[in-house]
């Protein structure tokens, strides 16, 4: 059954429970906010992870391939267990981007801490990739697919692999 809430950024949003991403431990700095939906323009690689418990809380995200086509985060096995799957075909990654309001062309992406999604259960967790070479503030070129903006589920084409702790 559809439900609605009001987002400060997007106004009234209608969603179903199948749209909700459940973060069992929240996100860093937002540990108490555990239910989120993806919203945004179909034709824009930047989507918004909108919290349904706090209409003021929305984070811009994108798929790693929009930022770095050869991105291959190594994810600790215990994080894979937390989302309930070790099968790469069940998993997808999102990257949180930072878009400075006064200078959106200075967008950066946090490649070090991707969001790991189980596409079947909609459980998600932000993880620290074991790839130390991935920066927290990777400068993003806005000349390609990315442009700062405003539902589809991310494709599972972005690669992630497990690594023992």
Roles of regions detected by a PLM:
Residues 2-68, 88-165:
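Long, compositionally biased stretches
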